[in-house]
Amino acid sequence: MNSRKKGMTLVAKQRTAGWLFLAPASIMIAVMSFYPMIRAFIISLQTGAGANMRFADPIFSNYKRILADKVFQQSIVNTFLYLIIQVPIMLILAILLAQLLNNKDLKFRGFFRTCVFLPCATSLVSYSLIFRSMFATDGLINSILIKLGILSTGYNFLGNATSAKIVIILALIWRWTGYNMVFYLAGLQNIEYSVYEAAKIDGANGWKTFWKITVPLLKPTIIMTFIMSINGTLQLFDESVNLTKGGPANSTITMSHYIYNTCFINVPNFGYASAMSFIIFIMVAVLAFINLKVGDTRD
């Protein structure tokens, strides 16, 4: 009887210790994540500014306004265009680079890994300004194209809606490919080499080995990077602000950029900005849920 009581006391102590260790992190998550989300939803139902904030009448008027806001609709189209084009290209490049740089016979692979990873260590503002200067009418890209005889005069890449979007997509791919490559490298190094040897003995070529072994074993990592990339692209801000300032004529503006303008640049409207922010939150949550469901192979 005494031994049972002692055993129960030990279990109770372990549970208490576990909850004590868990409590600080749980409190921080609640304060830094859940409270702001709840507060943002409450503000999204209000109008006014500062101490004059009050609930709107009708209460969902900010959300109703979104349906008629052409600029916000344009920002959604722009953001999803970046998402649909940039994310797949970036992740495919990241997987291929990881596969290439995971080769044990490759010389200076540490140096090449560092070179590919370095772009994501640069400042967001700095790299945006570098791309802006490169694609200016008197920038490096125009100078090269003129010398090659492709152009006769400098082309305003950032002054045209289509080319400006392409510049933003190129900038995103350049910066974030190396970041995702690191995750795939870690995943590749956890795959036993004996698996590849067995496939080679069975007569599988390089493409079959990659498609039938590497990709399925990297599936959890691919899903994780895909969700992170979706989350990051839907909240895209720096490139739109620093590269094109949302122009020309809001043709490259992103959702986060428009929310920032609504909240701080134009006449401040915190309620409407919060409503748009909550729409982004719902988009991220829905897309993440779909990704997890599609990638879940458990019975």
Question: Model-found features: residue ranges?
Answer:
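N-terminal hydrophobic targeting signals that begin at the initiator methionine
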Residues: 1-2
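A structural signal for multi-pass alpha-helical bundles of membrane permease subunits
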Residues: 5, 10-299
